[in-house]
Amino acid sequence: MIEYRGDHKVTAVDAQTGTSKFEIQEDVKATVINALPNMRAGLVAVNAGLNNMANGRWCGVNYLTFESTAAKDVHVLGDSIQIAAGMPKSGHMANAQAKVAAAAIVAQLNGWEVNPNPMLTNTCYSMVDAKNCIHVASVHQYVAAEKTFKTVAGSGGVSSIDLKPEVTMLEGAYAESWAQNIWADTLA
């Protein structure tokens, strides 16, 4: 059985006994524990002084270019940024952000107009076993009037809760193909 305890603040994990200790709630013993620390910008971003949002947890950016709002000509993307509403923190999203940032940098270096209407796509696959998978997908459009990205209405997609095994196996094949393509694209 899997239990999510999002309202529990973990203060310690005893790997020897498999026990999670919480700030308020009683200790929980489990066979497998996946304790996740609070997310925040990475140490490189913090040491560079770029973490200027949400009490220093995240880096603010101009979403049109992904230029830092704390340092001119420095671009930040991926897990370190303060995300727009509905924007996931995923490798696919970081890859899409990098493309928008790279295009903006090239435009700025050449004195061209930065693309005023960038779009981002996202797909996240989660393997539920060695062959079966579920997914979530979305498209995000830059909204100039609000200076942020918004999820495009109707663009989201998630695996149905009632998927048959042959469908989740097909999604597993899609996930493998997606992984090969995103790695090739990212490392090209």
Task: Write out the residue ranges for each language-model feature.
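A conserved short coil-to-beta-strand element within the FAD-binding core of flavoproteins
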Residues: 2-18
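A structured beta-alpha segment of the ubiquitous adenosine-cofactor-binding alpha/beta core
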Residues: 10, 22-26
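Glycine-rich beta-alpha junction loops
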Residues: 10, 32-40, 123, 128-132
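Hydrophobic residues embedded in beta-strands of well-ordered beta-sheets
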Residues: 18-20, 133-134
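FAD-site-proximal beta/loop scaffold in flavoenzymes
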Residues: 28-95
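FAD-binding beta-loop-beta segment adjacent to the flavin cofactor pocket
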Residues: 57-75, 130-149
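A conserved FAD-binding loop/helix module that cradles the flavin
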Residues: 80-122, 126, 136
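C-terminal auxiliary extensions adjacent to catalytic cores
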Residues: 136-188
